[in-house]
Amino acid sequence: MSKVLEAKQSAVEEIKTKLSASASTVIVDYRGLNVGEITELRKQLRDAGIEFKVYKNSLTRRAVEANGYEGLEGALTGPNAIAFSNEDVVAPAKILNDFAKDHEALEIKAGVIEGKVASLEEIKALATLPSREGLLSMLCNVLQAPVRGLAIATKAVADQKEGQEA
């Protein structure tokens, strides 16, 4: 087998593995961004633990078909880059959406969220959600509210009794 064919097959395997292992994958069109802007975007994504890579569309298409993600083929035209996140589902969508607001040249096309193909609208909706840590802190606040209310009521009763004794 030729070295070129082996390299292409290993690239398809790499994409397949990353697609199946990632919690969130977002495909973007980076046409129109200059080198400085792409470097800035890569740094933001890297700091969040997200891999951002450019693959040939034909190789990506083969990996997408092998993983059974129907509906992504339409997004695989033109110059594309793919952001893979193995841990945080929201982070790639949030970072790319925020970057796209400041840089109109970046266009979010589609993605895969926890094994399901997601449209542009779904990715933008995901980007507006708070991060996992933010959601957990909201949940803690909701769970603490009744306990806090009980503690305040108990303290008020104790203060009232002290006031009556004095």
Curated annotation (Swiss-Prot):
Molecular function (Gene Ontology), one example: structural constituent of ribosome
One CC-aspect GO term: large ribosomal subunit
Record flagged with keyword Ribonucleoprotein: yes
Database matches in InterPro entries: Ribosomal_uL10, Ribosomal_uL10-like_sf, Ribosomal_uL10_bac, Ribosomal_uL10_bac_type, Ribosomal_uL10_CS_bac
Keywords from the UniProt entry: Ribonucleoprotein, Ribosomal protein, RNA-binding, rRNA-binding
One GO term of the biological process aspect: translation
Biological role stated in the UniProt entry: Forms part of the ribosomal stalk, playing a central role in the interaction of the ribosome with GTP-bound translation factors.
Family: Belongs to the universal ribosomal protein uL10 family.
Subunit structure: Part of the ribosomal stalk of the 50S ribosomal subunit. The N-terminus interacts with L11 and the large rRNA to form the base of the stalk. The C-terminus forms an elongated spine to which L12 dimers bind in a sequential fashion forming a multimeric L10(L12)X complex.
Name of the featured protein: Large ribosomal subunit protein uL10
Native organism taxonomy: Bacteria, Bacillati, Bacillota, Bacilli, Bacillales
